[in-house]
């Protein structure tokens, strides 16, 4: 026993107060307390990890400051009020019993449940945060998906529009190619029609002048005619008047032979002078023909003024002068053109100069020269 307990017992004896019963009645029921509560055991303070016990509210009867009537002693003496003050100063120390093992196990399970609940609350909060983040991520992914689908639709529309434009361009290209082919055919027809017309004109001119083919001299060996196709075209223009001139010359010669009674002379043939006239006259112009006609008219007028001594001689001289003037005029123009164009062969010019016929002398000598010329030709 401690000194304090002995002092309390002595005081109870003196004051005739049983404080032990009051202490037993004031024992609180064991409750769960905090683990930091300190308990006195045998006067030694030692920390014990124990649940904190909340003291119960004392009743009015158990309150230490309550005024309780003191019992009268045998001597009839009254106790002093100081005792009450002393009792109020001395607080009863309650030493609660240790908690049993079952209570400790229950407390541990409760703590565990609390810790589990706290952990669950923390995990639930983190899970809720994760769920919120996941929902946010899902929304973002859905938005991206929608945007991608819209982009794909736009690209598909663009591709369809490009295909439509491509088909339209292809149709336009085909139409243009058909138009080009039509134009080509039209141009070909126009050119062919022009060529056909030229061929027809040439064929008609060849039919109208059959004597030219028989009287024409082959000039395929001459390099001048091969190098100048334009000159050949110009010659073909004068084929008709030259053939007419050749026929006129033959008629004149035939009439002269009839009037002169040249029976021993053969039928009139084409003289070298006429051939030279036809060859040289191909490149002649109508101006030379007009000049020849004018010269012939002048000669005829001059011959008319002369005295008509012999009608036959006058006729023959006038005719042969006309022929000679025409031939010399044609040959002179041909020589000028040959001088301008240096591509003409020298052989053709020499042949033309050799084939010239000149009737020099009076009206009586012309017949003799013509007979000599025919005799030399037959030899």
From Swiss-Prot:
Annotated compartments: Cytoplasm
Comp. bias intervals (Polar residues): 39-54, 211-225, 354-365
The protein's name in its UniProt record: Topoisomerase I damage affected protein 11
Species for this entry: Lachancea thermotolerans (strain ATCC 56472 / CBS 6340 / NRRL Y-8284)
GO cellular component: cytoplasm
Family according to the record: Belongs to the TDA11 family.
Comp. bias intervals (Low complexity): 114-128, 200-209, 283-305, 343-353
Claim: Cytoplasm is one of the keywords in the record: yes
């Amino acid at each position: 026993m401690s000194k304090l307990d002995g002092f309390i017992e002595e005081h109870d004896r003196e004051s005739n107060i049983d404080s032990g019963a009051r202490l037993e009645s004031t024992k609180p029921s064991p409750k769960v307390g905090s683990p930091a509560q300190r308990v006195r055991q045998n006067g030694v303070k030692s920390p014990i990890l124990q649940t904190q016990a909340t003291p119960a509210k004392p009743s009015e009867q158990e309150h230490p400051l309550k005024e309780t009537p003191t019992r009268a002693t045998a001597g009839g003496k009254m106790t002093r009020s100081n005792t009450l003050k002393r009792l109020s100063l001395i607080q009863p120390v309650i030493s609660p019993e240790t908690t049993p093992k079952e209570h400790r196990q229950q407390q541990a399970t409760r703590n565990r449940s609390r810790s589990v609940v706290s952990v669950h609350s923390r995990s639930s909060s983190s899970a809720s945060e994760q769920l919120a983040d996941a929902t946010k991520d899902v929304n973002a992914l859905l938005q991206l998906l929608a945007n991608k689908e819209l982009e794909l639709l736009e690209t598909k529309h663009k591709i369809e529009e490009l295909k439509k434009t491509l088909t339209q361009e292809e149709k336009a290209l085909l139409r243009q190619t058909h138009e080009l082919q039509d134009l080509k055919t039209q141009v070909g027809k126009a050119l062919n029609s022009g060529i056909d017309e030229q061929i027809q004109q040439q064929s008609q001119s060849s039919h109208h002048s059959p004597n030219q083919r028989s009287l024409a001299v082959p000039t395929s060996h001459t390099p001048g005619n091969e190098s100048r196709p334009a000159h050949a075209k110009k010659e073909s223009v004068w084929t008709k008047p030259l053939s007419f001139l050749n026929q006129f010359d033959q008629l004149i010669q035939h009439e002269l032979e009839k009037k002169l009674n040249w029976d021993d002379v053969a039928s009139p043939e084409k003289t070298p002078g006429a051939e030279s006239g036809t060859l040289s006259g191909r490149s002649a112009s109508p101006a030379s023909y007009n000049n020849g006609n004018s010269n012939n008219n002048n000669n005829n007028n001059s011959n008319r003024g002369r005295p008509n001594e012999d009608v036959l001689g006058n006729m023959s001289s006038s005719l042969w002068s006309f022929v000679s003037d025409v031939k010399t005029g044609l040959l002179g123009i041909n020589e000028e053109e040959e001088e301008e164009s240096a591509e003409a062969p020298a052989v053709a010019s020499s042949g033309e100069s050799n084939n010239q016929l000149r009737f020099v002398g009076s009206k009586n000598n012309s017949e003799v020269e013509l007979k000599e010329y025919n005799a030399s030709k037959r030899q």
